[in-house]
């Protein structure tokens, strides 16, 4: 029997600054590859071989931007369970049984100040899964540090967690 999904959100990196840096860095290798390998020029004062440049171009010029493009954070709320999947880092979703959550609240936070940036982060306020923005839901557990789930739809996530906890307690009664 398939479980009811109360909330699902898939987020990608949207920060213009991040994409500017990634694409500018990749562009350097695109220029080098085109100039040296395709146009038979010499790129730089101490050029590497065409094969070496082709390998570095593939990694930095193609796979690095593709890696950031494919990276995503999927959050799902099911009855009694929160699942977080940060692709490509997680092979399986991180499952958080909501019965272990003492309390939770919708928060506005500073990604850089509180957690040191975006992604899977550990900061002075605990662990965070976030992709962009500064809103989310902070989960406080009975036996461990807080967990922040960043969301572009933090209010909906909060409501779904509340509903999932209520559904689980009704099912267990």
Model-inferred region functions:
Residues 3, 123-173:
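A membrane-cytosol interface segment of integral membrane proteins
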Residues 1-49, 129, 154-156, 171-173:
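N-terminal membrane-targeting/pre-transmembrane regions
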Residues 81, 88, 153:
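A short beta-strand motif that forms part of the nucleic acid-binding face
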Residues 76, 95, 148-151:
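Short aromatic/basic micro-patch
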Residues 52-68:
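Canonical hydrophobic alpha-helical transmembrane segment
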Residues 79, 98, 154:
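ATP/adenylate-binding site constellation spanning eukaryotic-like Ser/Thr protein kinases
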Residues 64-80, 91:
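Transmembrane-cytosolic junction motif
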């Amino acid at each position: 029997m398939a479980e009811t999904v109360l909330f699902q959100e898939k987020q990608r990196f949207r920060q213009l600054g991040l994409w500017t840096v990634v694409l500018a860095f990749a562009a350097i290798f695109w220029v080098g590859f085109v100039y040296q390998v395709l146009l038979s020029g010499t790129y730089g004062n101490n050029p590497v071989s065409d094969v070496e440049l082709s390998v570095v171009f593939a990694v930095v010029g193609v796979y690095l931007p593709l890696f950031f493009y494919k990276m995503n954070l999927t959050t799902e709320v099911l009855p009694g369970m929160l699942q977080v999947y940060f692709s490509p880092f997680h092979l399986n979703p991180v499952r958080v049984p909501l019965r272990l959550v003492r309390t939770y609240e919708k928060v506005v936070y500073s990604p850089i100040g509180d957690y040191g940036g975006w992604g899977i982060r550990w900061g002075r306020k605990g662990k965070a899964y976030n992709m962009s923005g500064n809103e989310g839901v902070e989960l406080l557990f009975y036996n461990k540090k807080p967990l922040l789930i960043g969301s572009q739809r933090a209010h909906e996530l909060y409501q779904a967690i509340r509903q999932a906890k209520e559904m689980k307690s009704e099912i267990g009664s």
